[in-house]
């Protein structure tokens, strides 16, 4: 008996240090909240053993979610405006120009896998968040499911991270624990790899759209544009009247993406105590199927509004040149558009001081704004700027389908012109100058009025000069002049008979010569395009 007790005590003494050493290792493997593993994690967290009751709950959750009957193409849809009536064409006088405004019905259909993040909802956005795939997600107000969570694995795509350093296991996937895990991954890269990769270039995602309606821009950029436009303040009223042209640009500089390993079964994302009945009570059903944020892009998001009061058809080309930095020195019209345009920028991220910046300026300064934050480092921290969701049922990508109709407004300016008459011939001359002026009735139909110069068919002796001012809506200009020869058989001889001339800024009509040899010229200065 004593020998047995001695052996037993010896075994206890031998095993005690081993147990203490094991406890120390376990303690060092978790943070204070016992939520994040600091060791290199496996590709996906191992499923912890379940009791028979917990396994029953997990099986019921899997069966329920995988049995939800819905069409993934119809779950997330944004229907914008429907246009029934297109306003008619109209024209109006504006200073020394006549403006013609035309409207056409257009439509936009956009499939967005990436949902934009703005500051107001960044607190709801984190990798692995469980959300309902419904209209609130479409409206960029994700309805996060408040349930207990199991573990998940995050990975980051910063360069150089080896030996599983780019991954981390979150034992209890709450928002705070996940955000702490993301910070741990970023800090791990800063400490171990940043020196070897001092200039990590941001991945650029660029999209633009000429602005005509808010519904159109929401369909293009997602419902996050509603919040962005509170700062951009696109002037839809002036655009609709043809007095402004504006373009909106989304410019993303992505520093890194944090991705979530796909769950092998839906229940893997839930805590052991969660039941099917709890999910049903939270409104999870075929109309509100569960999804999860599978990837979050961190970086700098710039929204730009480019504005001009030019009526030129080259405005889009000028804006593109300003953004790309392309030289337009050889094109006077593009140069003038850029010179007389402005921009407003709303910037999220990329600054250690301010999370959101609003900047106004001239297009000449635009490139400086876009160049900032081009590389990732401690001084240019990234914020969540976009996220992707997947259906929990089958890990299929959850795509938001946006569509809207809108009225495209275009305007063209026709500058006033002038005809300068100079008669220095050795004869009596008579002129007949006429033109048409075009306006529009309330239905947009053309109203053409024929106009005549008040001095038509009146005899003029040399030296006679006059100027006829024509409005921008003048067209089909006819210039006729004849001279008196004094010959009985040909009392009047035609000097000039030019018809259907276009309106130009300065048209110089000169006649000279003798009764038998009259001459003329028709020269144009500063033609109007």
UniProtKB/Swiss-Prot annotation:
The taxonomy runs: Bacteria, Bacillati, Bacillota, Bacilli, Bacillales
Q: Provide the protein's localization.
A: Secreted; Host membrane; Host cell membrane
Query: What is the recorded name of this protein?
Result: Listeriolysin O
The superkingdom listed in its UniProt entry is Bacteria
> After gene disruption, what is the outcome?
Cells lacking this gene have severely reduced cytokine production in the mouse Listeria-infected liver cells compared to wild-type.
Substituting residue 49 to A results in:
Does not affect secretion and hemolytic activity. No defect in phagosomal escape. Shows a clear attenuation in virulence
- State the organism of origin: Listeria monocytogenes serovar 1/2a (strain ATCC BAA-679 / EGD-e)
Q: Does the keyword Lipoprotein apply?
A: no
The annotated consequence of residue 488 to F reads: Decreases toxicity by about 40%, decreases cholesterol binding by 25%
Question: What topology does it adopt in the membrane?
Answer: Multi-pass membrane protein
* Effect ascribed to mutating residue 262 to K: Loss of hemolytic activity
**According to the UniProt entry, how is activity regulated?**
Activity of listeriolysin O is regulated on multiple levels. It should be high in the phagosome, thereby allowing escape of the bacteria from the phagosomal compartment. Then, once inside the host cytosol, the activity must be controlled to prevent lysis of the host plasma membrane and loss of the intracellular environment. Multiple regulatory mechanisms include translational repression, which is required to minimize levels of listeriolysin O in the host cytosol. In addition, cytolytic activity is pH-dependent.
Sequence positions bearing Phosphoserine: 44
Q: What is the effect of changing residue 262 to W?
A: No change in hemolytic activity
Q: What is the effect of changing residue 44 to A?
A: 1500-fold decrease in virulence
Sorted UniProt keywords = Cytolysis, Hemolysis, Host cell membrane, Host membrane, Lipid-binding, Membrane, Phosphoprotein, Secreted, Signal, Toxin, Transmembrane, Transmembrane beta strand, Ubl conjugation, Virulence
